[in-house]
Regions:
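Glycine-rich phosphate-binding loops of nucleotide-dependent enzymes
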Residues: 2-266
Length: 266
């Protein structure tokens, strides 16, 4: 059988900020029904890579392919139109609006006129009905879909952002530090939610500094250093210590030492 084709693929991405090289020929692949984590030290190029994949910036060189077709995202709107949704670390939710309005933010449902023309009046009943069904499908617990987001906990707000991405993403979702600044219980809820999103058939890219979360969620782990992909590992093939050693540019001897430290019985 032939290898599955990547849903999203990048080859040789380069990005300069003056004399600073943020991406230096970076490669990336995301396959159907998988979670890929991107890890790396500060300045490794993780955020720049994600911004290029989500249309937040344009690479100076290289190419991006979506379902095998070369694409050029000139804005996040281009990526969204192509079916890529991104959950940013700062969430980008509207605190004063209710949950349903946040799910439909920028995509509000409106009543149709007698000739099929869209009217300005929002169809709040439809938005609340669809949002409630979506939350039930993802097993997200809230008191009411009419709650203003500002009344929610940090974990629940993150759940709203993830649910919005899952509703509108046709191809994949990108999540930047999805559990940052959350408590233990809220973190558990978000991790479980990301798993359910993937189980629903949506592949996911995550950036995280939390290695236990990365090793719990990810099918594959892309390790970046100095703007390049230096390795792709799995939780089965490498330990956390080994992944960190690769990430920091450890020597072969140091990597062997990391492997020895985590051998069973040691």
């Amino acid at each position: 059988m032939s290898e599955p084709r990547p849903i999203l693929e990048a080859r040789g991405l380069v990005k300069h900020y003056g004399q600073v090289v943020a991406l230096d020929g970076a490669d990336f692949e995301l396959y159907p029904n998988e979670i890929v984590a991107i890890i790396g030290d500060n300045g490794a190029g993780k955020s720049t890579l994600i911004k290029a994949l989500s249309g937040a910036l344009q690479a100076d060189d290289g190419e991006i392919r979506l379902d095998g077709e070369r694409v050029r995202f000139r804005s996040p709107g281009d990526a969204r139109s192509a079916g890529i949704e991104t959950v940013y670390q700062d969430l980008a939710v509207a605190p004063s609006l209710d949950i349903a309005s946040n799910i439909f933010l920028g995509r509000e449902a409106r009543f149709r006129g007698p000739l099929g023309l869209g009217l300005r009046l929002l169809d709040k009943r439809r938005m609340r009905r669809e949002a409630a069904a979506h939350f039930a499908e993802l097993e997200i617990g809230v008191q009411s879909i009419k709650q203003p987001v500002e009344s929610l906990s940090g974990g629940q707000r993150q759940g709203v952002a993830v649910a919005r991405a899952a509703k509108w993403a046709r191809r994949l979702a990108i999540m930047d530090e999805p559990t940052a600044a959350l408590g233990v219980r809220e973190t558990r809820q978000v991790l479980d939610l990301i798993q359910r999103v993937r189980e629903g058939g949506l592949p996911v890219i995550i950036i995280s500094h939390d290695m236990p979360h990365v090793f719990e969620l990810a099918d594959r782990i892309l390790i970046m250093r100095l703007g390049k992909r230096v390795a792709v590992v799995t939780p089965e093939s490498h330990t956390m210590s080994e992944a960190v050693a690769i990430m920091t540019g450890a020597t072969a001897a140091e990597l062997q030492q990391a492997m020895t430290k985590e051998e069973p019985g040691e």
